[in-house]
């Protein structure tokens, strides 16, 4: 798997000197206790307790330190007592990383029999957080507000998901996309403003001729290929019939050579996402298939036909999902059976095996597109369950994230003449409304499909990144969506 930085999140508690040292010590103890209680909510990122801030100077210095820290991916703020919000203005003015406002309190219940004014004075986040919330709103700051008892499982889940999103935002600012060949000729939606994306997201897109990859592949040894083929044999199903067929074994080994060449090329250039094009294969024996699936399984972002936006999006979502159950996808064909409308998603070859229901099979079949030799690919049916589809498009002067909540379906019918990876789903609120809404929003035919992430996480990411977002869900109606798109258009024109 591709590795990401070991990020941390700083837990910052606000108060003021008015309460005296004894109360401030209690506030700090409570903050430490909460941090300890939250320590296990993320398998990857830790929450670091910071001293209670009580003045404009301490707030400014702490937020400045967080802003310049290489490992701090964001801060979690909480007002245990009342913290006059004017103290936060200077610090928040220069802070640009993800910000969470945790609206909670140390105690879950009111101590009915013993409560007194001392308790009230030292446990007043119910109105201290409102003061802090006001100044955030007054300053127009983007932030995540989570309300509830800090030890509640739902609150912990929300916090963990936000941390994954914030870390992915930080990490994705360093995404580099290697683009082998250009855009598929005459295709509109896969093109876009690369300079704008570099400014907005930090995504760097570099173009290469396919010969640059072939040159690296030519240096791969037979021993390296044989070793990787043996790994394929351990991890996936290769039929005995295929193993006896020298031409098919050679085809699988050619994909191993492509995988090794791609890996070497990407590692050397520091790339974590890439695109290919079936129109640009000079010097290649096959269209990359199995090789691409393997790299996605390791965490690389990918999209076909030069679609650099989707490739970067897949990489970003894989960071957020910790590499789990997330893949490049394409809406391919519809099932219009009344009351059971579904979409079959696939691509020519390139669907990530992290969404496979069972152990994938390596098969070799002809592929008319590209005009090359028969390519090896992983063949499998996709899993069922709740998922999201995400598409990022250049809508002219800005980027738009289009989301659709979907429900993955178990594939119950055999498709013996379709030897590719395939996934079946029902979109919310229905195929008819979802398709109409998607088309009205300008969503692409290439997407990232994830069973691991939620629409809320992606909406949070869009807000952090400063781009427009459109969600198609069970509550969507075409009438409301059209108005939303018009309002968004007006808003972004005003912001120019």
Curated annotation (Swiss-Prot):
Keyword tags: Arabinose catabolism, Carbohydrate metabolism, Isomerase, Manganese, Metal-binding
Gene Ontology biological-process annotations: L-arabinose catabolic process to xylulose 5-phosphate
EC number assigned by the record: 5.3.1.4
GO CC annotation, single: cytosol
UniProt cross-references to CDD domains, sorted A to Z: L-arabinose_isomerase
Protein induction: Transcription is repressed by glucose and by the binding of AraR to the operon promoter. L-arabinose acts as an inducer by inhibiting the binding of AraR to the DNA, thus allowing expression of the gene.
Pathway connected to this protein: Carbohydrate degradation; L-arabinose degradation via L-ribulose; D-xylulose 5-phosphate from L-arabinose (bacterial route): step 1/3
Domain of life according to the entry: Bacteria
Record field: catalytic activity: beta-L-arabinopyranose = L-ribulose
GO molecular function: L-arabinose isomerase activity; manganese ion binding
Protein residues bound to Mn(2+): 305, 330, 347, 446
Cofactor note: Binds 1 Mn(2+) ion per subunit.
Cofactor(s) recorded in Swiss-Prot or TrEMBL: Mn(2+)
Family: Belongs to the arabinose isomerase family.
Function: Catalyzes the conversion of L-arabinose to L-ribulose.
Database matches in NCBIfam families: PRK02929.1 (NF002795)
Record protein name field: L-arabinose isomerase
Lineage, opening ranks: Bacteria, Bacillati, Bacillota, Bacilli, Bacillales
């Amino acid at each position: 798997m591709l590795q990401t930085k070991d990020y941390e999140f700083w837990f910052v508690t606000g108060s003021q000197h008015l309460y005296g040292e004894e109360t401030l010590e209690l506030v700090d103890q409570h903050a430490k206790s909460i941090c300890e209680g939250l320590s296990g909510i993320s398998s990857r990122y830790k929450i670091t307790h910071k001293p209670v801030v009580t003045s404009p100077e301490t707030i400014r210095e702490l937020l400045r330190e967080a802003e310049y820290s290489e490992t701090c991916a964001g801060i979690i703020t909480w007002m245990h007592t009342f913290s006059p919000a004017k103290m936060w203005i200077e610090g928040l003015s220069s802070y640009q990383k993800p910000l969470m406002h945790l609206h909670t309190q140390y105690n879950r219940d009111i101590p009915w029999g013993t409560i007194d004014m001392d308790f009230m004075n030292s446990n007043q986040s119910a109105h201290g957080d409102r003061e802090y919330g006001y100044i955030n709103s007054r300053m127009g700051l983007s932030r995540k507000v989570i309300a509830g008892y800090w030890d509640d499982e739902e609150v912990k889940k929300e916090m963990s998901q936000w941390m994954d999103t914030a870390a992915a935002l930080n990490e994705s600012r360093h995404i580099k996309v290697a683009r082998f060949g250009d855009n598929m000729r005459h295709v509109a939606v896969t093109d876009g403003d690369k300079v704008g994306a570099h400014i907005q997201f930090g995504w760097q897109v570099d173009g290469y001729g396919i010969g640059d990859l072939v040159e690296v592949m030519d240096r791969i040894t037979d021993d390296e290929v044989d070793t990787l083929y043996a790994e394929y044999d351990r991890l996936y199903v290769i039929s005995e019939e295929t193993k006896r067929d020298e031409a098919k074994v050679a085809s699988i080994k050619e994909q191993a050579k492509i995988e090794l060449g791609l890996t070497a090329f990407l590692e050397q250039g520091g790339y974590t996402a890439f695109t290919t094009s079936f129109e640009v294969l000079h010097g290649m024996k096959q269209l990359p298939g199995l090789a691409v699936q393997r790299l996605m399984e390791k965490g690389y972002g990918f999209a076909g036909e030069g679609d650099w936006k989707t490739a970067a999006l897949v990489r970003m979502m894989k960071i957020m999902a910790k590499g789990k159950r997330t893949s490049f996808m394409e809406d391919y064909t519809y099932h219009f059976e009344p009351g059971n409308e579904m979409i079959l998603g696939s691509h020519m070859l390139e669907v990530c095996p992290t969404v496979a229901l069972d152990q994938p099979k390596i098969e070799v079949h002809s592929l008319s597109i590209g005009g090359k030799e028969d390519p090896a690919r992983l063949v499998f049916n996709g899993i069922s369950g709740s998922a999201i589809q995400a598409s990022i498009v250049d809508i002219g002067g800005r980027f738009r994230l289009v989301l659709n909540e979907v429900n993955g379906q178990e594939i119950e019918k055999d498709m013996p003449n379709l030897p590719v990876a395939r996934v079946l789903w029902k979109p919310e609120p229905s195929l008819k409304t979802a398709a109409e809404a998607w088309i009205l929003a300008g969503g692409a035919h290439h997407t990232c499909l994830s069973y691991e992430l939620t629409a809320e996480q992606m909406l949070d990411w869009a807000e952090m990144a400063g781009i427009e977002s459109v969600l198609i869900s069970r509550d969507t109606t075409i009438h409301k969506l059209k108005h939303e798109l018009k309002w968004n258009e007006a808003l972004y024109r005003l912001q120019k």
